[in-house]
Amino acid sequence: MVMGGEASMELDQCFQKMKMEGISIKEWKDIPVELLMRILSLVDDRNVIVASGVCTGWRDAISFGLTRLRLSWCNNNMNSLVLSLVPKFVKLQTLNLRQDKPQLEDNAVEAIANHCHELQELDLSKSLKITDRSLYALAHGCPDLTKLNLSGCTSFSDTAIAYLTRFCRKLKVLNLCGCVKAVTDNALEAIGNNCNQMQSLNLGWCENISDDGVMSLAYGCPDLRTLDLCGCVLITDESVVALADWCVHLRSLGLYYCRNITDRAMYSLAQSGVKNKPGSWKSVKKGKYDEEGLRSLNISQCTALTPSAVQAVCDSFPALHTCSGRHSLVMSGCLNLTTVHCACILQAHRAHNAVPHPAH
């Protein structure tokens, strides 16, 4: 593997330090832990796993030094691999187990919960075989979870989601896209009651949720920044009004195919932008973002909307763009909204008109 300049410099510094301290390496097992971990940070996870079997010294060093592991490359026998690895890698904070085909079962997730108590980020997307047992285990074994991806997991219930939120109250990012059975108004009420640090929530294609569930979220998760409601066909303007009123830091909202959304929802968003600009839209970390407020809005297939209402949203949030290459206001399938334009296009048009043209 080719090393970058910074990584190569760090290794050189380690070797120089060893030279100054008179440390000699006669066998691989003699490599200092600090140097071993720096070397392993430069190779892929397959080689890290191989290295953990070289000798007991390496195994112990990796066991207590490895904090990130990705096994999404494993196309076969991931369940067995997880069962064999997690008892050794007890200091993991980030674990990616994304699958192209269902492999993971409840016993593997239970092993993770039993051994990896410091876990903060876990990707279990497309784990079609895991059930409520897995979520109950995570609730008790991994209370420090801040990021959890369960997208495409279809075999657990809303009761298990509610139970998980009672114990994993630090969750900030939760992906439940396609979890139709598990995502109900009761599940959203539990998230709103227990996870007030939530910042990003994907509920795409969870078609059973209604305004009651979304309003519970809005009231309970005021720090929400990103919310995907694409394909949530039952929600109406009431959901968007609640989000506009309570989630003043909202930056990205997906409403694709929410055909019950009307102009009232758009005007509530526009009004929230005007109302919150003086104080709360200002970014705390100046320089990272010019201002807060909506930067991404998907209203594709929301065919009840009119140009004036959508233009009002666009005018309230200058970070929404319709111009080529910067599309952050997505309106596919809304043929009546072709006249809606962002500030960039209007400014370019004015600049063009201001330039004197030679007489013909």
Curated annotation (Swiss-Prot):
GO cellular component, one term: SCF ubiquitin ligase complex
Effect caused by changing residue 128 to S: 60% reduction of auxin binding. 70% reduction of auxin binding and loss of ubiquitination-mediated degradation
Tissue: Expressed in embryo, seedlings, hypocotyl, roots, leaves and flowers.
Coiled coil: none
A UniProt-annotated Pfam family: LRR_6
InterPro entries linked to this entry: F-box-like_dom_sf (IPR036047), F-box_dom (IPR001810), Leu-rich_rpt (IPR001611), Leu-rich_rpt_Cys-con_subtyp (IPR006553), LRR_dom_sf (IPR032675)
Pathway connected to this protein: Protein modification; protein ubiquitination
Residues noted as binding (indol-3-yl)acetate in the record, renumbered to the chain: 127-128, 149-152, 175-178, 202
Domain of life: Eukaryota
Classification via SMART domains: LRR_CC
Keywords, alphabetical: Auxin signaling pathway, Lipoprotein, Myristate, Nucleus, Ubl conjugation, Ubl conjugation pathway
All copies of domain F-box, residue ranges: 25-71
Induction info: Cell-cycle regulated expression with higher levels during early S-phase and G2/M stages. Repressed by auxin through a ubiquitin-dependent pathway (at protein level). Only biologically active auxin promotes proteolysis of SKP2A.
GO molecular-function term, one example from the UniProt record: ubiquitin-protein transferase activity
Processing after translation: Polyubiquitinated and subsequently targeted to proteasome. Auxin promotes this ubiquitination-mediated degradation.
GO biological processes: auxin-activated signaling pathway; cellular response to auxin stimulus; lateral root formation; positive regulation of cell division; protein ubiquitination; SCF-dependent proteasomal ubiquitin-dependent protein catabolic process
Subunit-level organization: Part of a SCF (ASK-cullin-F-box) protein ligase complex. Interacts with CUL1 (RUB1-modified and non-modified isoforms), SKP1A, SKP1B and ASK18. Recruit DPB and phosphorylated E2FC. Interacts with auxin. Auxin controls the interaction with DPB.
Domain notes: The F-box is necessary for the interaction with ASK proteins.
Protein name: F-box protein SKP2A
Species name: Arabidopsis thaliana (Mouse-ear cress)
Gene name in the database record: SKP2A
